[in-house]
Regions:
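Extended, low-polarity segments enriched in aliphatic/aromatic residues
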Residues: 1-133
Length: 133
């Protein structure tokens, strides 16, 4: 899904439906569907936590695997809010992109963050990161 980041939010929302293919390659519909599905009370109120494993991630080239754009960071992001988890994941992807001379992905350009705020799922500006040993 063309959302800037395909992580915890996408996994919890589009991963919960059968016909997710209709949202692929839709730059506005994909993020809208992701956040609207997350906002369903039966999903949002029952979530426990989200994990984003950054031991291996792809930071460019879209949905198709491309080994040229695989990064590694020995970090697990764990959080109650999948939107916040994706926000911190995006920071890691952005660093990898910048190291390769690619355009950074800014949180304000990622529609799932904007839509999540509008739907009351959280504002990434309020997200906090705690580093645990």
């Amino acid at each position: 899904v063309n959302m800037g980041i395909n992580g915890a939010s996408t996994n919890l929302s589009l991963g919960a439906i059968d016909n997710y293919q209709r949202f692929l390659n839709k730059p506005v519909l994909g993020p809208a569907a992701t956040t609207e599905i997350l906002a369903i009370p039966e999903i949002w109120q029952k979530r426990a936590f989200s994990i984003l494993d950054l031991s291996k991630f792809q930071f460019a080239a879209g949905q198709s695997f491309d080994a040229e754009f695989v990064g590694r960071d020995p970090v697990l992001l764990l959080g109650e809010n999948p939107i916040s988890v994706d926000y911190f994941g995006l920071q890691v992807l952005t660093l990898a992109r910048e190291k390769r001379g690619m355009k950074a992905r800014k949180p304000e350009d990622v529609l799932i963050f904007r839509y999540a705020k509008e739907l009351g799922l959280g504002d990434v500006k309020d997200a906090k990161l705690f580093d645990l040993p």
